[in-house]
């Protein structure tokens, strides 16, 4: 099966701008990244997207691809395929050969950045609103203290692999209709490291790393919300060959509150009123995350009426002020009435106490919706 067209892979037209190429690449790279997408073919699709972007994001490579496609320029001044063996460095490096890479191999001993780590932290409602300072312990791969990360028993050292001579790759020559081709593959004797460890460290078993519980201090900013994450630079797994450490990403989960509901920076709650309070009006103390606040409820207040207390919501996590607290009224229907109370209600009903305006009936559901939209 032939290779797919690069423009098709990225879902763009041949006239696409560099901004469009970059935008579609980022979207697809996030979609198929093996750390996010666990489907069996995700890694292959991610590699395919990356390869397409590497060519189309480079104006020179893109022009050559538009002219020659996957077959390459062949005899158009690039040396062709005939004659001596051409070193392609494996199929993944074919475009390096065509577009200036010259079949360069990767140095197995080059510094490599460590893996990123993810930690899920569960906060109480108030902790998310006000923030906190805390320490967490996470298991992470650290350089082995016994062998200083070499993987070799103290007093010994790794040796250069005699099969790949330290390159980490083996060359396999094949005869093709185009001539002899050298295909590179990872050295199976040293697993691509370029080193052999005759005497392995007893502590780490030759890996050069051990798992340790590491205490890390985390500053939770005020106003953080469910699903947001905090990046702690350099607190991921250790790098290899002197490379930098990865990062730690702390993903936030927030426990539900019994009384408050949060939407963005705004906080919502429901305030129960008796018939008498709703009809006659009242002044009540209402709880907020910042303390109690007095609210005047005017006479004739209906279920669904909302009041806003400005600035009593959650602080914006980026420091852009505070949200508001929205209070939705709920008039409670009594369920356990004494005979005297029932008689009084019947008398009230006979005096015309059951009259209500059409406007009140029509708008009650509109007010309910507005309350949850923060209007």
From Swiss-Prot:
Binds 2 Zn(2+) ions per monomer. Signal peptide: none annotated. The keyword Phosphoprotein does not apply. One of its GO terms (cellular component) is cytoplasm. Zn(2+) 2 binds at residues 161, 164, 187, 190. Residues 5-69 form the J domain. Belongs to the DnaJ family. Participates actively in the response to hyperosmotic and heat shock by preventing the aggregation of stress-denatured proteins and by disaggregating proteins, also in an autonomous, DnaK-independent fashion. Unfolded proteins bind initially to DnaJ; upon interaction with the DnaJ-bound protein, DnaK hydrolyzes its bound ATP, resulting in the formation of a stable complex. GrpE releases ADP from DnaK; ATP binding to DnaK triggers the release of the substrate protein, thus completing the reaction cycle. The J domain is necessary and sufficient to stimulate DnaK ATPase activity. Zinc center 1 plays an important role in the autonomous, DnaK-independent chaperone activity of DnaJ. Zinc center 2 is essential for interaction with DnaK and for DnaJ activity. This is Chaperone protein DnaJ. It comes from Oceanobacillus iheyensis (strain DSM 14371 / CIP 107618 / JCM 11309 / KCTC 3954 / HTE831). The lineage of its organism: Bacteria, Bacillati, Bacillota, Bacilli, Bacillales. The gene is dnaJ.
């Amino acid at each position: 099966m032939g290779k797919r067209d690069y423009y098709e892979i990225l879902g763009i037209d041949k006239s696409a701008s560099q901004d469009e190429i970059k935008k579609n690449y980022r979207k697809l790279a996030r979609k198929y990244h093996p750390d996010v997408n666990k489907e069996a073919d995700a890694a292959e699709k991610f590699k395919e997207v990356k390869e397409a972007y590497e060519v189309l994001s480079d104006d020179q490579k893109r022009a050559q691809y538009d002219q020659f496609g996957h077959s390459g320029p062949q005899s158009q001044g690039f040396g062709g395929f005939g004659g001596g063996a051409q070193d392609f460095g494996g199929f993944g490096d074919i475009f390096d050969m065509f577009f200036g890479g010259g079949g360069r191999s990767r140095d197995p001993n080059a510094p490599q950045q460590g893996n990123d780590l993810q930690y899920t932290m569960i906060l109480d409602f108030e902790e998310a609103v006000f923030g906190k300072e805390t320490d967490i312990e996470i298991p992470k791969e650290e350089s082995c203290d016994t062998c200083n990360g070499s993987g070799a028993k103290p007093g010994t050292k790794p040796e250069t692999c005699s099969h790949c001579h330290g390159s980490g790759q083996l060359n396999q020559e094949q005869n093709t209709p185009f001539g002899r081709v050298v295909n590179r593959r990872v050295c199976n004797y040293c697993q691509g490291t370029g080193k052999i460890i005759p005497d392995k460290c007893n502590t780490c078993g030759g890996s050069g790393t051990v798992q340790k519980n590491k205490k890390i201090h985390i500053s939770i900013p005020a106003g953080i919300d469910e699903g947001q994450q905090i990046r702690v630079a350099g607190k991921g797994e250790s790098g290899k060959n002197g490379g930098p450490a990865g990062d730690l990403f702390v993903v936030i989960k927030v426990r539900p509150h019994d009384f408050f509901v949060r939407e963005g920076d705004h906080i919502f709650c429901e305030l129960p009123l008796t018939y008498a309070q709703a009809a006659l009006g009242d002044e009540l103390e209402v709880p907020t995350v910042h303390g109690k606040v007095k609210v005047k409820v005017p006479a004739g207040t209906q279920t669904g009426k909302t009041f806003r207390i400005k600035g009593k919501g959650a602080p914006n996590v980026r420091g852009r002020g505070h949200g508001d607290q929205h209070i939705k009224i709920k008039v409670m229907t009594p369920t356990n009435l004494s005979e005297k109370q029932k008689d009084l209600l019947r008398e009230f009903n006979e005096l015309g106490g059951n009259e209500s305006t059409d406007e009140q009936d029509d708008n009650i559901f509109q007010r309910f919706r507005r309350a949850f939209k923060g209007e």
